[in-house]
């Protein structure tokens, strides 16, 4: 029994280290620090939680430092006590930038013998900016312009995400974005101008509860530090989104937002594109390798690559996008 308990606690420690980004709570005091983290349902760590299943994992962390004793932590997940333990080390680092996030590393847990177990005191996350914007992405990402910049990545480590222009490789998220100069020329651009978002707007169905088109019940926003019970769990920006018509088909019809086609095809082709056809999802800095347009007569026309740049996300935002989504976790974070 002790061995099983230790194994479960070690899994919890790894979950806290590998699937959580933290936000300080206003319940904190000089004697007690309280943090919260919200993350999509884990594909690895499955705790015993009271009550019905949730589509999110809300974590409350209470850090106490008794006089003349080492620090100990109390962890609640979705309101259920997960552990009271003394970490061998506890490193914290505030993330510079607009999101009020804190990185943490928990060393090996041991029993916190004789310590009081505080009740869950959540308070409210102290947050400033709760959205990942285009400006955040552009100022922290690296443009990938040549095949040579990708040649050091082991091919087997490249994981395609969705069907249109997103990959995860060796700890980083790669996505196509509209070039900055095009954004300045097009003020009505979608707020998150990734190729995956364009494809989603162009081809999604009209059922807002569709999991594949809208991500219903599969997403959180880690930047908020907490997910409410009534959250629909949808996303407009996650690269997991793909039209439900593409689940078993390389061809998908255009269903709306036709004005976006002007940034994907030549002016003489864009008005007549009625569908998209996806190519095999090999990562390449040329957007035209991802898909092509299909005209009413069945003819295929190439995409225009010039308005698009492949971006390698920063470690922080790669983690944020990954932790937001059950689907991405199952694809990328299925063991540790």
Swiss-Prot record:
Keyword Oxidoreductase appears in the UniProt entry? no
Query: What subcellular locations does the record give?
Result: Virion tegument; Host cytoplasm; Host nucleus; Host Golgi apparatus, Host trans-Golgi network
Induction / repression = Expressed in the late phase of the viral replicative cycle.
* A GO cellular component annotation in the UniProt record: host cell nucleus
Q: Which UniProt keywords apply?
A: G1/S host cell cycle checkpoint dysregulation by virus, Host cytoplasm, Host Golgi apparatus, Host nucleus, Host-virus interaction, Inhibition of host innate immune response by virus, Inhibition of host interferon signaling pathway by virus, Inhibition of host STAT1 by virus, Inhibition of host STAT2 by virus, Inhibition of host TYK2 by virus, Interferon antiviral system evasion, Late protein, Modulation of host cell cycle by virus, Viral immunoevasion, Virion, Virion tegument
Q: What is its main location?
A: virion
Record region (Interaction with host BBLF1): 67-69
**Would you say which domain of life the source belongs to?**
Viruses
- Single GO biological process annotation from the record: symbiont-mediated perturbation of host cell cycle G1/S transition checkpoint
Q: How does it assemble?
A: Homodimer. Interacts with BBLF1. Interacts with the capsid. Interacts with BKRF4 (via C-terminus); this interaction is important for infectious virion production. Interacts with host TYK2; this interaction participates to the inhibition of host type I IFN signaling. Interacts with host STAT1; this interaction leads to STAT1 dephosphorylation and inhibition. Interacts with host STAT2; this interaction leads to STAT2 degradation. Interacts with host CUL1; this interaction might facilitate CUL1 recruitment to STAT2, leading to ubiquitination and degradation of the latter.
Similarity remark: Belongs to the herpesviridae cytoplasmic envelopment protein 2 family.
Report the function annotation for this chain: Plays a critical role in cytoplasmic virus egress. Participates in the final step of tegumentation and envelope acquisition within the host cytoplasm by directly interacting with the capsid. Upon virion binding to target cell, a signaling cascade is triggered to disrupt the interaction with the capsid, thereby preparing capsid uncoating. Activates the AP-1 pathway and enhances EBV reactivation and virus release.
Protein name as annotated? Cytoplasmic envelopment protein 2
Organism from which the protein derives:
Epstein-Barr virus (strain B95-8) (HHV-4)
């Amino acid at each position: 029994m002790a061995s099983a308990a230790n194994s479960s606690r070690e899994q919890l420690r790894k979950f806290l280290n590998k699937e959580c980004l933290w936000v300080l709570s206003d319940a904190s005091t000089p004697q007690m620090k309280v943090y919260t983290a919200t993350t999509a349902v884990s594909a690895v760590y499955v705790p015993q939680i009271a009550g019905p299943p949730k589509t999110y994992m809300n974590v409350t962390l209470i850090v106490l430092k008794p006089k003349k004793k080492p620090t100990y932590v109390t962890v609640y997940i979705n309101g259920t006590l997960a552990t009271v333990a003394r970490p061998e080390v506890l490193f914290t680092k505030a993330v510079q930038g607009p999101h009020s996030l804190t990185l943490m590393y928990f060393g090996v847990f041991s029993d916190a013998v004789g310590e009081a177990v505080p009740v869950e005191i959540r308070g409210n996350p102290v947050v400033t900016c709760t959205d990942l914007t285009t400006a955040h992405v552009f100022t922290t990402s690296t443009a990938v312009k040549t095949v040579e910049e990708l040649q050091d990545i082991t091919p087997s480590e490249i994981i395609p995400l969705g069907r249109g222009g997103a990959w995860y490789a060796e700890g980083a998220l790669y996505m196509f974005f509209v070039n900055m100069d095009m954004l300045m020329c097009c003020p009505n651009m979608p707020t998150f101008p990734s190729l995956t978002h364009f494809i989603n707007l162009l081809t999604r169905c009209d059922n807002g509860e569709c999991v594949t088109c809208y991500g219903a019940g599969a997403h959180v926003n880690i930047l908020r530090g907490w997910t409410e019970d009534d959250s629909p769990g949808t996303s407009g920006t996650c690269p997991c989104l793909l039209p439900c018509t593409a689940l078993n088909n390389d061809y998908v019809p255009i269903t709306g937002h036709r004005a976006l086609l002007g940034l994907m095809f030549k002016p003489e082709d864009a008005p007549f594109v009625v569908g998209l056809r996806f190519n095999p999802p090999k990562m390449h800095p040329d957007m035209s390798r991802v898909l092509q347009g299909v005209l009413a007569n069945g003819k295929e026309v190439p995409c225009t690559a010039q308005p698009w740049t492949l971006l390698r996300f920063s470690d922080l935002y790669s983690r944020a996008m990954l932790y937001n989504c059950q689907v991405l976790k199952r694809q990328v974070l299925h063991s540790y």
